[in-house]
Amino acid sequence: MAKPSRGRRSPSVSGSSSRSSSRSRSGSSPSRSISRSRSRSRSLSSSSSPSRSVSSGSRSPPRRGKSPAGPARRGRSPPPPPSKGASSPSKKAVQESLVLHVDSLSRNVNEAHLKEIFGNFGEVIHVEIAMDRAVNLPRGHGYVEFKARADAEKAQLYMDGAQIDGKVVKATFTLPPRQKVSSPPKPVSAAPKRDAPKSDNAAADAEKDGGPRRPRETSPQRKTGLSPRRRSPLPRRGLSPRRRSPDSPHRRRPGSPIRRRGDTPPRRRPASPSRGRSPSSPPPRRYRSPPRGSPRRIRGSPVRRRSPLPLRRRSPPPRRLRSPPRRSPIRRRSRSPIRRPGRSRSSSISPRKGRGPAGRRGRSSSYSSSPSPRRIPRKISRSRSPKRPLRGKRSSSNSSSSSSPPPPPPPRKT
């Protein structure tokens, strides 16, 4: 008893939880016997007051929790009856309905008249004519309720298509109008409650839908911003940036998304890479110009078609390593027709030496438009010292032309 009494005393003083309060009630009797007189009064007062307050607090929230559930259930319960009522008329109209709907009545017909007429078929419990309250005149239809289903069926058979006050009347089974009148206010009262949460939910859903959609819309933009950065080096390798950079102002205005992707990174990056690569960029151009010059040589002379093939096979690794800036080939292609006649003019020089280097030099020098072959070799010989020996070597091995520069470059190759 000592252990439980201690556990009960401490909660009675603290009154922290509802369980402790309930224990303080049950444990108040043993605590009296064990505790002193002063502690009794304190424990009793403390235990009684917090226990009541805590218990009331603990009991009240579940009641509150139940109370909202009650109205929610009440709000939910009324709508099913209208659905049942909607489905029931079809069933009752065939089987159980005791009310006849009499339509197309004249304004002279009263409820008493209907009761007399339909009373011939059986006991009539209730008769009602729909009134237009604004004008206080009958709307032209009424309801007659019979006590027995058989009587209602007889009345429906005889009175459907009969004449009352010179008008042909339609009689059909329906539900009494009172249920119709009384039922709509319930669903109407319940409907706003439902509609309000639905509208709130719809608004919340719309907001939720709007929220994720906006980030989704923004996410593709972010992706596009990132994707061009990732894709930009590839187009640079594929010669796109230089074609786009001169044409970019014209292409940016129409605003095709693909071109924007290609153009936006050059706007951001070209400043830094152009500054950083400007000194280093010319050598890669020089290295790359000859490989594209070689196919044109091949076109010119079939004998040289065989020689460049080994060059292409062996040279691709350095080209791939230096591939990212392929900007010069555009200029090479645009100026290539001018340089071809230059080759024909330089035929007086040994054809292998004059034509080969002229094509290489003219194409590699992206800034010289159509210079004489003599000027080109001077500029290119300085810039292309590293790669000429490679081709010179191969050309000398394939073709009997030997040039002085080839022997030193092989160490540069390695």
From Swiss-Prot:
Ranges spanned by the short sequence motif Nuclear localization signal 6, renumbered to the chain: 373-380
Keywords: mRNA processing, mRNA splicing, Nucleus, Phosphoprotein, Repeat, RNA-binding, Spliceosome
Chain span(s) of sequence motif Nuclear localization signal 3: 284-291
UniProt entry tagged with the keyword Repeat: yes
InterPro entries found in the cross-reference section: Nucleotide-bd_a/b_plait_sf, RBD_domain_sf, RNPS1_RRM, RRM_dom
Chain intervals for the UniProt region annotation (Required for isoform 1 function in petal development): 218-219
Entry annotated with the keyword Phosphoprotein: yes
Motif Nuclear localization signal 4 location, chain numbering: 318-325
Broad class of the protein's primary localization: nucleus
Short sequence motif Nuclear localization signal 2: positions: 229-236
Disruption phenotype: Several developmental defects, including defects in flower and leaf morphology (petal development), delayed flowering time and root growth. Hypersensitivity to glucose (Glc) and to abscisic acid (ABA) during early seedling growth, accompanied with an enhanced ability to accumulate ABA in response to Glc. DNA methylation establishment and maintenance defects. Altered alternative splicing pattern of several related SR genes.
Single GO MF annotation: RNA binding
Motif (Nuclear localization signal 1): 62-69
Renumbered residue ranges of the record's region Disordered: 1-95, 175-414
Induction note: Levels of the isoform 2 are altered in response to sucrose depletion (Suc) and temperature changes; reduced in cold but increased in warm temperatures.
Swiss-Prot/TrEMBL GO biological process terms: mRNA splicing, via spliceosome; regulation of alternative mRNA splicing, via spliceosome; RNA splicing; sugar mediated signaling pathway
Compositionally biased intervals (Pro residues): 404-414
Job of this protein: Involved in 5' and 3' splicing site selection of introns, and may bridge the 5' and 3' components of the spliceosome. Isoform 1 is required during flower petal development and isoform 2 is involved in root growth. Negatively regulates glucose and abscisic acid (ABA) signaling during early seedling development. Involved in the RNA-directed DNA methylation pathway. Modulates KIN10 stability in response to sugars, probably through the splicing regulation of 5PTASE13, a protein implicated in the proteasomal degradation of KIN10.
More about this protein: The splicing pattern of the pre-mRNA is regulated in a tissue-specific manner and by development, and changes in response to various types of abiotic stresses.
Protein name: Serine/arginine-rich splicing factor SR45
Organism in which the protein naturally occurs: Arabidopsis thaliana
Highest classification ranks of the organism: Eukaryota, Viridiplantae, Streptophyta, Embryophyta, Tracheophyta
